[in-house]
């Protein structure tokens, strides 16, 4: 198959989970003999190689502002792809739904990964949230056979709220171990002597709640916050006004090896994401064998299962859970040992690639996967064949 992917910043890029998703999925599809294109935002790449791990890269312009970067780049991609011999395209972000009309009018097969419930994100204006909701309403009408949700709860929301059937395919994660624990000392940290937040500093990721809970904890451990906002915000300024000297702001860290070491050597990873589906940052933490303490939401519960601890949307409850971990370090060790099993159970990137490959084949063949598949995680019709292709490499 000839497959095009767009809607993200491009690859290789580490800003968010969408770029990680493209960076993991596209090379795996290419390794199976498919011709894969990933579109990249030209202004974000000073170096512009023509390929990456067997994937062709195409750089197109965008207007780099908070509200215009995604739609302007997606529009450029949607027009460019019309002039290429592509069997199927994967577009991310529900805000791009309206732009999928362009390739759909020309008979192209389009799959739209709707991502999270963007209309609930406080970082957007009231007008922006209404636009996301309208896009979600429209998505199933534009791509009736091509809607992808990344969690069972998201699948339920789209069916009950918008009457839209979807295929549920989650994200994945790799299992990685620490290679150089001394890296954390470059950030003023000591291995297993700090708690970690690793996320964009936006209100729905709950860094304010986590800081308030941590401030109530009697411990000599630090709270390391790896991440920042893409744009200047009063929310971030407020976070940094904490008087607790144990709270350390590390800023955005683009070095993936450093991100890995910060994860692998933390005492506990605290995940405060309150909006969205299967969160790539949470899966990544499991892949790094973290002890996971996650905000209790339907999406987080779905991923965490019995492999981590949940806290309520209350600093006092978080403080109590932190205190329990402080008193029972053996529980931390036990959760760390079990974490990677969660990834192997259902969230490996090879499994995700199997699902997408099978799903794309069915779209190209004219099937209706969303209508034919039961609710819950998508099960490839040709799973054994797909696994064989992974093991045997390129065709």
Regions inferred by a protein language model and the residue ranges of each:
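Conserved acidic donor-binding segment of nucleotide-sugar-dependent glycosyltransferases
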Residues: 309-316, 324-330
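Donor nucleotide-sugar binding/catalytic pocket of nucleotide-sugar-dependent glycosyltransferases
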Residues: 137-180, 189-192, 197, 248
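N-terminal strand-loop element at the rim of the active site
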Residues: 8-14, 22, 28-65, 153-159, ...
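Membrane-proximal helix-turn-helix segments that form the acceptor-binding/catalytic region
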Residues: 82, 105, 128-147
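Acidic donor-binding loop of glycosyltransferase active sites
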Residues: 261-277, 290
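An aromatic- and histidine-rich active-site surface loop
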Residues: 71-82, 86-119, 277
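Nucleotide-activated donor-binding/catalytic signature segment of Leloir-type glycosyltransferases, i.e.
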Residues: 236-257
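Conserved donor-binding/catalytic core segment of Leloir-type glycosyltransferases
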Residues: 4, 186-218, 224
């Amino acid at each position: 198959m000839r497959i095009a992917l767009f809607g993200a910043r491009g690859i290789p890029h580490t800003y968010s989970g969408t770029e990680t998703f493209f960076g993991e999925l596209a090379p795996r599809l290419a390794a199976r003999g498919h011709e894969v294109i990933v579109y990249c935002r030209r202004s974000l790449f000073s170096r512009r190689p023509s390929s990456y791990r067997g994937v062709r890269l195409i750089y197109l312009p965008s207007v780099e502002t908070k509200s215009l970067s995604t739609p302007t780049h997606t529009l450029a991609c949607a027009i460019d792809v019309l002039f290429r011999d592509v069997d199927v395209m994967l577009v991310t972000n529900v805000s791009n739904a309206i732009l999928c009309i362009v390739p759909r009018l020309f008979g192209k097969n389009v799959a739209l990964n709707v991502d999270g419930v963007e209309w609930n994100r406080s970082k957007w204006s009231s007008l922006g949230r209404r636009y996301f909701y309208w896009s979600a309403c429209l998505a199933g009408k534009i791509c009736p056979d091509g809607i992808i949700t990344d969690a069972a709860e998201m699948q339920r929301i789209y069916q009950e709220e918008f009457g839209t059937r979807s295929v549920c395919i989650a994200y994945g994660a790799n299992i990685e171990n620490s290679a150089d624990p001394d890296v954390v000392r470059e950030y003023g940290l000591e291995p297993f002597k700090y708690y970690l937040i690793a996320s964009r500093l936006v209100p729905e990721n709950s860094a304010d709640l986590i800081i308030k809970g941590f401030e109530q904890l009697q411990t000599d451990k630090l709270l390391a916050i790896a991440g920042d906002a893409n744009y200047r915000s009063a929310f971030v300024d407020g976070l940094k006004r904490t008087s607790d000297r144990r709270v350390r702001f590390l800023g955005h860290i683009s070095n993936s090896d450093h991100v890995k070491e910060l994860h692998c050597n933390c005492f506990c990873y605290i995940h405060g994401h309150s909006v969205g589906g299967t969160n790539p940052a949470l899966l990544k933490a499991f892949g790094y064998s973290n002890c996971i303490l996650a905000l209790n939401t339907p999406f987080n519960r779905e991923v965490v299962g019995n492999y981590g601890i949940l806290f309520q949307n209350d600093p006092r409850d978080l403080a109590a859970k932190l205190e329990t971990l402080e008193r029972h370090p053996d529980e931390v060790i036990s959760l760390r040992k079990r974490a990677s099993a969660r990834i192997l159970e259902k969230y490996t990137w090879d499994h995700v690639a199997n699902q997408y490959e099978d799903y794309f084949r069915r779209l190209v063949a004219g099937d209706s996967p969303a209508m034919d598949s039961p609710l819950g995680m998508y099960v490839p019709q040709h799973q054994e064949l797909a696994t064989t292709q992974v093991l045997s490499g390129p065709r």
